[in-house]
């Protein structure tokens, strides 16, 4: 009887205090995805889209893209409700961690730390991890959608977790070298998760292995696979880690702008048609929304098959690092979900990819040949 009473009291505590992702109605949700649309002038009848705050949304309870009537700049959307828990939190009992390579409400930015953006908030029971691509977001004192985020497309994913998962989350973030602007670490969390103190002290992993992939189970039981890399690894997260690990060809949408010595990494065509990495060129969404990758700052991956006789592996990944030359020397990561319904929503979003150049195709062929020769003589 006493054990039953303790269980009931514990459940009451969880329902009253525990942090989770919230949906567009402010209700708890296991996970959600948002796709903030670019500033699209060709949708004058839709004010949020035309002013750059419109967004598509879906979550575990309704796996269909829904165009929301409100913009992301107002106080009645999933991101707002989720973050509001942090703004209303008790700092004595809440662990919170905000990182962004461009700090909000500031001109401070970093081109050497991890190219990573996110928020993680936990109490003793549960919490959430929100991974996104929005520069200068969120503010650490109140919800405000930054004006710089209106023009380009942005994406994010929020996942609810039991607090025991914070151990794995922290270990993954330890690879990033995050540019941290808010970190609240109650002593109870420091005692339970020692790596958090290292993160607070701006430490990060510098010794092999320089990459890590871990499976994380959400509060509702959904399995996600997270990929993390350090800048010291010096390779592309997508073509050198995600694709080979998933054993699949992938299409990748990331920032498609070049400047100075920072150039876009080319698409990589696998001569065996098993493990290509193709950069996005055009995006096509429901509701007659389409635009060039040049207008998008999102970072997401869609697995695909190059064989008509082999079905694609239903993986979708959402993260925060680009396929650019400079970013092979920066930390970052992506969160992948293996789910057929989610995959269906993403499968055709990347409507056209950047073709491989002759040089990259020849390099890929030579690499395969060298591997075959080395294997033969082993």
UniProtKB/Swiss-Prot annotation:
InterPro entries: DNase_II. Glycans are attached at residues 51, 92, 111. It comes from the Eukaryota. GO terms for biological process: apoptotic DNA fragmentation. It holds the Pfam family DNase_II. Disruption phenotype: RNAi-mediated knockdown results in accumulation of apoptotic DNA in 1.5-fold stage embryos. Coiled coil: none annotated. Residues 1-17 form the signal peptide. Its EC number is 3.1.-.-. GO terms for molecular function: deoxyribonuclease II activity. Keywords: Apoptosis, Glycoprotein, Hydrolase, Nuclease, Signal. The keyword Manganese does not apply. Involved in apoptotic DNA degradation. Belongs to the DNase II family. This is Cell death-related nuclease 6. It comes from Caenorhabditis elegans.
